[in-house]
Amino acid sequence: GLSKMNQILAIDPDNCVARVQPGVRNLAISEAAAAHGLYYAPDPSSQIACSIGGNVAENSGGVHCLKYGLTVHNVLGVRVMTSAGEILDLGGTLLDTPGLDLLALLCGSEGMLGIVTEVTVQLLPKPPAVAVMLAAFHAITAAGEAVAGVIGQGIIPAGMEMMDKLAVQAAEQFAKAGYPEDADAILLIELDGTQAEVEELAARVERVVRENGAYQVDIATDADAQMRLWKGRKSAFPAVGRLAPDYYCMDGTIPRHQLAMVLRRIGELSAEYALPVANVFHAGDGNLHPLILFDANQPGQLEATEEMGGRILELCVEVGGTVTGEHGVGVEKLDQMCVQFDATELQQFFRLKEAWDPQGLLNPGKGIPTLTRCGELGGMHVRHGELPFSELDRF
């Protein structure tokens, strides 16, 4: 399998580029580039294990995607094999390449269009100075308003993460990160640049978060303290697993200014379904990861959890967001795709898939819902006895 294609083919420090096979672990790229003072910016929580090929398939982000972008913004080129066995080289190390941007199309296509066999990524110089701020709040809505306040000041942190009370307590007990367990929410805000820039930004950010209700602000400037703060965040998912036998991780995006309202609505859904929710997410770019806690051994809880998760994603669409940020669609979110896209848009997805993979060999049944499925959900209706786009597969 592709997991065995795990070689770093070249590190070019002069041009800040790495060429790797798809099975190379995300973190391994930064480890290999560290000797040159470089690193690869996208850093999903699973970076110790996830592969760069998987990152391309899902267009993964991570803590630092707010400032440095998603996978699509950091991949310069890919070599891809089509379902017909043809080899395509898309993108490259030049500033711009002519023709349509097929590289961007491949990023996030979930393996439905081609098989990536090689990836060229850009590397960045490590910033000269970094500070990580922990801001604690007595209300999660206040933390949400603080996020909008910081971005509204024109400040783009390297990373901006939020955790609610359940997540904070679980992570602190698991990782001993120094989180205040009495907080209803915390923000972790990373700032980077020159020493003078970081000091000036830290003062501005502290002022904004305090104006929005932060009762405790700690700033870590040494590497060990920063690592300890981030360890808690990156351990949050396994830590939350200690609170219940099972959890269901959602992944949706919303406009930042809707953050406080959406968190309040998620709290209302949690009460309605009597299912606890731990919120751990990339607050800076509005990428939510509500973790619904449940016990699959209790009759009806799994079904209730899936229904509640679907309603959270539909809420994201309702406020102008999307049903996925970085975890993809697969089969899990096919129903919600019918909510976000209409039949005309789905038609274009089908035609694109058919152009790349006419026999439907690559990851079939994923990513794009059939029109019949959407019809059953009420997302598409028969008009005067005729179905739209009759040339497309109904199943």
Task: Label the predicted regions.
Residues L166, A283-G286, G328-D335, P369-T370:
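Small/polar glycine-rich anion-binding or flexible loop at a beta-alpha turn
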Residues G309-L352:
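C-terminal structured "cap/appendage" subdomains that terminate the fold
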Residues F281, T322-V329, P364-G367:
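Short acidic/histidine-rich active-site segments
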